[in-house]
């Protein structure tokens, strides 16, 4: 697949963003169920905001290291965002009013409060995180049925090369 050198893809779909400097986003892009590193799922956009670890700990429950060249500590934010997006999608909530866009917007706490109020059953943020994980796992089962598996969870090889300036 010579073309992949010039047209980077994930799971057969073109990639919309180079994730060399955003490792949580790279993990999310590689493992997203939509392929292509779809910007509407698994994008821990807070990583681009260079928030200190104390701030991300308040938002997602764990500190996120700020080293743009390290994958250390970047898996959980990708999982957290994938689950948040899955729950938001299930509730019909536009991505642009959630923490996907900005840390001050809607998240699991808000979703739990709304779902509890509407259904009369108590939902906790932790329970909704579990719901998001189940949605994600079900989507992964569809991918497996269609012949995709862990070997397809990768960023394009080109994204492992150093940054270059100018036309590449």
Per-range role (PLM):
Residues 1-168:
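Extended C-terminal regions of large enzymes
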């Amino acid at each position: 697949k010579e073309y992949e050198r010039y047209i980077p893809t994930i799971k057969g779909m073109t990639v919309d963003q180079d994730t060399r400097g955003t490792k949580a986003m790279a993990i999310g892009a590689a493992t997203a169920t939509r392929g292509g590193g779809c910007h509407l799922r698994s994008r821990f956009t807070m990583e681009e905001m260079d928030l200190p670890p104390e701030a991300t700990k308040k938002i997602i429950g764990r500190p996120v290291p700020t080293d743009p060249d390290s994958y250390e500590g970047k898996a959980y934010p990708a999982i957290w965002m994938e689950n948040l997006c899955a729950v938001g999608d299930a509730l019909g909530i536009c991505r642009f009013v959630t923490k996907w866009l900005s840390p001050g917007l809607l998240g699991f706490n808000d979703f739990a409060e709304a779902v509890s109020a509407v259904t009369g059953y108590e939902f906790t943020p932790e329970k909704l995180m579990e719901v998001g994980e189940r949605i994600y796992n079900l989507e992964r089962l569809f991918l497996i049925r269609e012949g995709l598996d862990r070997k397809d969870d990768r960023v394009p090889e080109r994204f492992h090369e150093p940054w270059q300036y100018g036309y590449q």
